[in-house]
Curated annotation (Swiss-Prot):
Reactions it catalyzes: Release of an N-terminal amino acid, Xaa-|-Yaa-, in which Xaa is preferably Leu, but may be other amino acids including Pro although not Arg or Lys, and Yaa may be Pro. Amino acid amides and methyl esters are also readily hydrolyzed, but rates on arylamides are exceedingly low; Release of an N-terminal amino acid, preferentially leucine, but not glutamic or aspartic acids
Protein name: Probable cytosol aminopeptidase
Gene it is expressed from: pepA
Family affiliation: Belongs to the peptidase M17 family.
Biological process terms in GO annotation: proteolysis
One Pfam family hit: Peptidase_M17
Compartment list: Cytoplasm
Residues noted as binding Mn(2+) 2 in the record, renumbered to the chain: 264, 269, 287, 348
Cofactor binding comment, as recorded: Binds 2 manganese ions per subunit.
Top-level division of the source organism's lineage: Bacteria
Function summary: Presumably involved in the processing and regular turnover of intracellular proteins. Catalyzes the removal of unsubstituted N-terminal amino acids from various peptides.
Cofactor: Mn(2+)
The organism of origin for this protein: Xanthobacter autotrophicus (strain ATCC BAA-1158 / Py2)
Amino acid sequence: MSEPVTLSFARLTAAPKGVLIVLTDETLAFGAQTQKLLKGADAAITRAFDAERYKGKAWSTIDLLAPAGLDAPRLVVISVGKAGELKPADFLKLGGVAAGKIPSSAREATVVLDLPGAKIGPESAAEVALGIRLRTYSFDRYKTKKKDDTERGALAMTLLVSDEAGTKRAATTADAVGDGVLFARDLVNEPANVLDPPEFARRAEEHLSSVGVEIEVLDDAGLARAGMHTLLGVGQGSIKESRVVIMRWNGGPAGEPPVAFIGKGVTFDTGGISIKPAAGMEDMKGDMGGAACVTGLMYALAARKAKVNAVGLIGLVENMPDGAAQRPGDIVTSLSGQTIEIINTDAEGRLVLCDVLWYAKEQFKPKFMIDLATLTGAILVALGSEYAGLFSNDDTLSERLTKTGQETGERVWRMPLGPEYDKLVDSKFADMKNTGGRHAGSITAAQFLQRFVDKTPWAHLDIAGTAMSSPASDINKSWGSGWGVRLLNQLVKDHYEG
């Protein structure tokens, strides 16, 4: 990954350097310190506002080049709209908007976090810094030539804040979360010829062990001994071995049940024998977005020393067609003992998840399980790329995820589950089949998974529309988004830390 920006914090009264970015609201008012900084440029700013008919609509901006009366090469004014109604996601967005307004030629910039009638506290300021990091990330590992006219050189950004010491402390936590998001993005962006299941497992072990996460890796032989034959069936057509990575962070009281996160990690999905169309198949390198999120989340929890016991499990396979590949019509026995008829080998994600869910439930007896998977195209049809689909057997967990999603900007929308959908996944020859037909595709996938959680509180997040290839946003210009790391980190922080 590439992060060409160095961030620092200084007191609000410090002298700005380079491009100057200030904030206003819907009334076009400035904070007290900003007014002092801009005093000599009042006339130039007023003329610019009038000339552009600038009204201060939320997230609108105006640029002034070398304004008279101000010792800055460029002044950028950003309106936050209603200053008293900003949520954490808004401060994150503010950082992204600010970073996006700095020309690639700039080497220094200052953001003055000062608003009229609303103090920007340490945690909010740290969110702004995180937004800058997320916006300026790029994945250019395989580019041998740089576009000098568009790619940024080194940039030093200073955030002027009301509480310098407090912001630096808050930024330490935010940086841990940011590191988790960017690690997840790196994993999703990697090509599948580089990031196969063994390599994914190796990177997870190397990266997470550095922050105190305990790692256990099950290879093909270990998976067979454990009884994960459904997961192994998905990968049997590939020359690459499958893996399950178990990540434990013990930050809570000894003996307290952990919270559990499970990720689908199909490092490349051809569809298997039920092969996908060629168009767009290259994007199937990202079919491990759920596993990337869980890995990034576990890193974030450990790096910020979260006071919780947490376990993350990821099932890593490659779904390929060859003479040994699983066939439509095959019947496999899952770790739970339930049998599954394979109707479509391209409905493989649920086959990976079902064994890992059962393993997590039986081995760890968790407080809850949340699985994440780029599971169905149907959820993209239903919700687009703005929301992830949420399916749950527990109203409290569902409500917490929904509220946290609104606060963080990683939003979820609850979808139905019910016994009336069971008949769509019942099989004539086995306990169930792995597809339920064209109708209610996301629901039947979740209904299938629900058979492997028993009474454990559980939520399934279908992130097919949010994990990769989403439209560029103020905080992400990358193909892989790292979606879910911030959501689940905040869920743990708000509700499950001691």
